[in-house]
Amino acid sequence: GDAWKPRQRTSEGKYVAATPERAAGTRKALGAIIDAGLAFVNHVAPFLCEPAVLDPAFQARFKAQMLDALVFAGLVGKFGANDSKFVGLTHTNLQLDNAYFWTADDGSLECGLLDWYMCSRTAMAQVWLGCLSGADGECLAGHDLAIFRAFSDEHEAFGGPRVPPEELLERFTLNFPSYIIGNISKIETHILSEVPAEKWKGLASKDDVLDGPWNARCFSLMIANGLSYWYHKGDDHPGAVMLRWAAKHDLVVGDAV
């Protein structure tokens, strides 16, 4: 095996010189994943997406924008936790059966956790990706900043530091390309493994999917909602936000691969 082969040796000069090759390899691998996602919505479950998302011109732009953005994804991961204002106690799988909500006699609402697994200090923006994963793409595109303003107001009202909503939205958006690629990568293992391609032919609407198995339902709708959100953000799509962020911090491709 590889363990018995001579160890590969490198140097700073060789590493820098190989950057274009690594970047090209990364784009090729990610491009194949994106193609698989587009093939899924085009040929297996087109009813999940609005016509504008299925337009070949949009899909070509989306793929190019994703590839330009994803090269900086690793740096975004480090950026996400670089300021304690944007890190808090979170639960990354807080389904309704993991918590309780009880209205007391005086009308106040008491809330708490029943299942503390996956409860930890985490970058808020990354958790928001899951919180809003079921939101209709067009609706989310029109109200994302308002949602983060409401959260920021409540966070401060209950004793937390002021979380600038515009910055929280930026951090949320910077994580979006990785979020989409992560969902697409689950097509074979989580979607088609539960509902094979031939069974999708018997479905006609999102309502049919909502009655289906958990993983197939969640990941297929997250892919569709993510594509819709990207489309409805227009020129302010996540790829553009990523490139503006990279330029603001003087980042180049060589910093990220």
What name fits each language-model region?
Residues 1-91, 102-106, 218, 222, ...:
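ATP-dependent phospho-/nucleotidyl transfer catalytic cores
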Residues 1-8, 155-165:
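Surface-exposed helix-capping loop/turn segments at secondary-structure junctions
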Residues 93, 115:
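Conserved catalytic-loop position in the HRD/HxD motif
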Residues 94, 98-99, 122:
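Catalytic and GAP-homology cores of small GTPase regulators
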Residues 98-112:
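Conserved protein kinase catalytic/activation segment
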Residues 118-160, 177-202, 219-229, 233:
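Active-site activation/catalytic loop segments of kinase-like enzymes and analogous catalytic loops
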Residues 167-176:
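Short secondary-structure subsegments characteristic of cysteine-rich extracellular domains
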Residues 213, 217:
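Catalytic loop of the DD-peptidase/beta-lactamase superfamily, centered on the K-T-G motif
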